[in-house]
């Protein structure tokens, strides 16, 4: 591993996909970045649905679940508060975005209801959030349901900020490819084969970026992976480049919180040795407070509020 520090080489980039090589880092760091990009970048998603009228063939819960999985624009999500940190009773413009949907089957044929039919009624205050992500050529978005003549669907959705650790609907990435040691020099992969592993296991496209092993070379027990091939695909709620950038930023904050806790622990030990009993008596409590600083550190603090919001047509978009 070089002492130059982490290096990134972009191999391919598009609107929804970026392929890059991350080098001069160890396996733990590369895998931490992968996990953070998958589950710890905040986005906006529909969290609860109030159904006023539903005469379709689909149950309220079924439609609520489909609504929850619709990607919503989350570019300015940092300007939105977590609902658990907001001082409002249920939801407000500072912690949520309210969308409405009203559709009626008027034609003799089937009427399709798409995510484009969702209308934002909240005051966005200039923030780029809440709009359904529409990527198809027709500009319709996600199909929510189908209506026959005379059927009606009328509902109100409340979208809130969250991370994929709470529910997959808040995940910003559709898929993340992750590979290292394509020639299997480190023997981390045990190939299963019938006759010849070289013929039955096709080579990865990443093999061309590394030298093949020489036949007869001794195995290096001290060798470690330091080059990782990653491909990130976004669902559209956040641009794919921001998925990577915000993943790095989130990982830095998590490491910083640990460093802060360790630093304070060392300071408490110094104070204890010098006879500061007040500080020493609060060592355990203060360390716990530092570790739980920030909304991202405790995504389950409102676990008791994650059930159904009550009767009267409310359903969680889970």
UniProtKB/Swiss-Prot annotation:
Q: Which residues participate in Zn(2+) binding?
A: 86, 88, 92, 95
Provide the protein name: DNA-directed RNA polymerase II subunit RPB3
Which subcellular locations apply to this protein?
Answer: Nucleus
Q: For this entry, list what GO says about its biological process.
A: RNA-templated transcription; termination of RNA polymerase II transcription; transcription by RNA polymerase II; transcription elongation by RNA polymerase II; transcription initiation at RNA polymerase II promoter
Q: Which domain of life is it from?
A: Eukaryota
Matches recorded under InterPro entries: DNA-dir_RNA_pol_30-40kDasu_CS (IPR001514), DNA-dir_RNA_pol_insert (IPR011262), DNA-dir_RNA_pol_RpoA/D/Rpb3 (IPR011263), RBP11-like (IPR036603), RNAP_Rpo3/Rpb3/RPAC1 (IPR022842), RNApol_insert_sf (IPR036643), Rpo3/RPB3_RNA_Pol_subunit (IPR050518)
Organism, by scientific name, is Saccharomyces cerevisiae (strain ATCC 204508 / S288c) (Baker's yeast)
GO molecular function annotations of the record? DNA binding; DNA-directed RNA polymerase activity; metal ion binding; protein dimerization activity
Matching PANTHER family = DNA-DIRECTED RNA POLYMERASE, DNA-DIRECTED RNA POLYMERASE II SUBUNIT RPB3
**Composition bias, kind Polar residues: at what positions?**
299-308
Q: Keywords on this record? A: Acetylation, DNA-directed RNA polymerase, Metal-binding, Nucleus, Transcription, Zinc
* Residue ranges with Gly residues bias: 309-318
The entry's family comment says:
Belongs to the archaeal Rpo3/eukaryotic RPB3 RNA polymerase subunit family.
- Other noteworthy facts: Present with 10000 molecules/cell in log phase SD medium.
